[in-house]
Amino acid sequence: MTEQKVRKELKTDMPSIYSFELHEMKEWLKEQDEKPFRAAQIFEWLYEKRVTSFDAMSNLSKELREKLKAQFAITTLKTVIKQTSQDGTIKFLFELHDGYTIETVLMRHEYGNSVCVTTQVGCRIGCTFCASTLGGLKRNLEAGEIVAQVLKVQQALDETDERVSSVVIMGIGEPFDNFEEMLAFLKIINHDNGLNIGARHITVSTSGIIPKIYQFADEQMQINFAVSLHAPNTEIRSRLMPINKAYKLPKLMEAIEYYIQKTGRRVSFEYGLFGGVNDQVHHAEELADLLKGIKCHVNLIPVNYVPERDYVRTPREQIFLFEKTLKERGVNVTIRREQGHDIDAACGQLRAKERQEETR
């Protein structure tokens, strides 16, 4: 039995079949005295035909279907809330088997449909501007529960003959704090027999867990990599992101340079603009100095208002000035397009709102 299979079987008595990679399914079939080629058939039913019952897998023997039913669950998510924005963004609040809720967002772009997935129930990182960390971390998601989010959104898109064209792992939780499950998820959605989403159409983001950045670099995946930076120096970053006290900014930059050297890929830096905190011209100049010589791109993010937090949005004129200052210093930068502004679009907001209503 492989290490990964042990990892999954420790999670629950009935692991999600979506948590298994193709080679793991082949190994399981061998253990059951079944032909390994059946794995591709099972994956076709799961990811192309998107059935939610083993009984629907009509080209498998009844005996094999019974074995599958006895050992695996097909993870299903219950839609608790579905909010649709005027710009087409859809935010889902899904309920898991144990009653916990998670958020998933469908964002519509000119180039296709992007899904933002959650990797944890809650978050332990404690960023002082984020609604996701309110209430702390409850548990990690299994790879199958992350896969199920993409499939649930894809099922909604099937009604209009559309498909999920890209995935971003920027929802609730710190992906690198759930590293093994996140990695399995990446491999499943990228695989030809899985959801077949190209590596260049997948983005994973981290707040800066340095040891995992090195580990991720060594995987040498051609997946887009983003780092939540949000500050040009240690003092401001420690105020915004307590993780900076454990993983210092200079060491984080060293890890990022290792990633670039190892993969040949550029890094995206997420930089949320908070009024009067990190959005002045001198902050932009300091940020340009920090990133000098690094193969990177900066996404400036006009932050969504979170009622439980004290930060305010940077005025639009100041955002443009910040962008202009970076460009003048040779930094590749764009302002992220705002989506879902008329719904509970900030990460963790919908879940937090639902929890508040439950406690009234």
From Swiss-Prot:
The gene is rlmN. Keywords: 4Fe-4S, Cytoplasm, Disulfide bond, Iron, Iron-sulfur, Metal-binding, Methyltransferase, rRNA processing, S-adenosyl-L-methionine, Transferase, tRNA processing. This is Probable dual-specificity RNA methyltransferase RlmN. Disulfide bonds join 116-347. Its cofactor is [4Fe-4S] cluster. Gene3D superfamilies: 1.10.150.530, Aldolase class I. It catalyses: adenosine(2503) in 23S rRNA + 2 reduced [2Fe-2S]-[ferredoxin] + 2 S-adenosyl-L-methionine = 2-methyladenosine(2503) in 23S rRNA + 5'-deoxyadenosine + L-methionine + 2 oxidized [2Fe-2S]-[ferredoxin] + S-adenosyl-L-homocysteine; adenosine(37) in tRNA + 2 reduced [2Fe-2S]-[ferredoxin] + 2 S-adenosyl-L-methionine = 2-methyladenosine(37) in tRNA + 5'-deoxyadenosine + L-methionine + 2 oxidized [2Fe-2S]-[ferredoxin] + S-adenosyl-L-homocysteine. NCBIfam families: rRNA_mod_RlmN. The keyword Transferase applies. Binds 1 [4Fe-4S] cluster. The cluster is coordinated with 3 cysteines and an exchangeable S-adenosyl-L-methionine.
